Amino acid sequence: MYLPNCTYYVSTPDFTSSFLPQNTSCQINFPYSPNIAQVQPVREVAFRDYGLDHPSKWHYRGNYASYYSADELMHRDLLQSSSSRADVIFKNESLYSHRGGTSSPCNFFTGIGRNGVLPQGFDQFLDAPTSDKSTAEPLKQKTDCGVSGDTGSHRQALTKEDEHKDEVIGGVEEDSSSNCGDNNNQQNPPSRSRKKRCPYSKYQIRELEREFFFNVYINKEKRLQLSRMLNLSDRQVKIWFQNRRMKEKKLNRDRLQYFTGNPLF
């Protein structure tokens, strides 16, 4: 980038090469109007000194004076930063370098902050999280208290509902037990009225066995005759003969298995 009607001086020690002629300086003139204001040389634009580097780093600074002061350059570069942050960071005017050629190295932060690592300018950023934590803890406690209160009321409601359910279940069980008792009482009289099973006497069994020996199937007349003689009902005699026939079949089956298993017989 160049500006019209400007004279650019290039120093020999800075830009030297074996391929270039060893002239002291090269002057370039441009035929433009001289009314345009003079600007600083290209050396000052290309190699700014913000007061951050040691003067011995750049050897060319010993022969040329800085057109802009370090304060103005620093102010121009920090225009976009917020004023509050700039006030906190740049507290002392001694932090800036007023002369680039003879200025000493500049330290932006002279002291160490609270945490022992960052400078003092970062203390405000460290205070904000702690304050947020301190404000968040009471809110958390309040929310915990609210949640605990809600849970306590919910538990009380659940306990009341459980008690009510238990009472209802107990009443239902009592009603069911009373109903069962009534049903048992209603069913018990018929069972008591039922006649007990009385075995046949020896005389009755002997007469029935003798009749079964002659006739496996008994007719109705013979059955009525036996019932009158043995003082039994017609139905009892009929059932006894049915059971006796089933018993006889079982005995015959057992005899058959016994003889087939023993070939000696």
UniProtKB/Swiss-Prot annotation:
DNA-binding positions: 193-252
Record keyword RNA-binding present: no
Region named Disordered: 123-199
InterPro entries, per database record: DUF3528 (IPR021918), HD (IPR001356), HD_metazoa (IPR020479), Homeobox_CS (IPR017970), Homeodomain-like_sf (IPR009057)
Compartments in which it is found: Nucleus
GO cellular component, one term: nucleoplasm
Residue ranges, compositional bias (Polar residues): 177-191
SUPFAM superfamilies registered for this protein in UniProt: Homeodomain-like (SSF46689)
Chief place where the protein resides: nucleus
Similarity comment: family membership: Belongs to the Abd-B homeobox family.
The protein's role, per its UniProt record: Sequence-specific transcription factor which is part of a developmental regulatory system that provides cells with specific positional identities on the anterior-posterior axis.
Name of this chain's protein: Homeobox protein Hox-D11a
